[in-house]
Amino acid sequence: MTHTVQREFPETPLFGVGAVIVESGRVLLVRRGQQPLKGKWSLPGGMLELGESLLFGVAREVREETGLEVEPIELIELLDRVHREDNRVRYHYVIADYLCRVVGGSLQAASDADAVRWVERAEWNSHSALILDPITVRVIESGWQRASALNSKDLGNK
C-alpha cells in the first residue's frame, strides 16, 4: 500500500534536511521551484524519505537539487518551520541543517530547484536583491561561523 505524504495542512510535522555548503568564501543557495517557498532563495534540502538516515538524506537532496555530491560534516541546527494560514497550520517541517562539503559532481539546478548559485557573504547578509528568510540567514550565519572555525582543508576550501 502506497502512502502519500500530505504536505499542505498535514496531520503531523514532516521531517526535512538542509545543507549549508561553504566553498571559496561563498554559500550555495537554490531558488525553490515548488511550494512551500516557491520562487524564493533558500538552502538546498528537502524531505527525508522513509528508512533514510539524516546524513544520507541531506546528501541525496543536495545531489537531486544541485548535481553536487556532498559529505555532511556536522549538524548546524534543528529547527521548526511553521507556516500558518487562516488559523490552521499549512506547512510544518522539522528541519535538520548540516554543514556539508563538496566532494564531486557538477553544479546544475534540478529536481524542485529552478536555479542554483554561489552567493558572496555580502549578498546573503544584507538587504540586496536576494531576499532571504531571517531563519535561513541565521542558519547560514551559524554554518559560516562553524566553517570558519574548522580547518579550510576539512571543507575542501581553497
Question: Where is each model-derived feature located?
Answer:
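Acidic, metal-coordinating catalytic segment for phosphate/diphosphate chemistry
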Residues: M1-G18, R88
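A conserved beta-turn-beta hairpin within the catalytic core of GNAT-like acetyltransferases
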Residues: P36-W41
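Short, well-ordered beta-strand micro-motif
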Residues: I21, D97-R101, R117-E120
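Active-site-adjacent beta-strand/loop module that shapes the phosphate/pyrophosphate-binding cleft
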Residues: R81-S106
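Nudix hydrolase/Nudix homology domain
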Residues: S106-K158
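The catalytic Nudix box helix
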Residues: L43-I76, Y98
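A cytosolic small-molecule/anion-sensing beta-strand core signal
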Residues: E23, R31
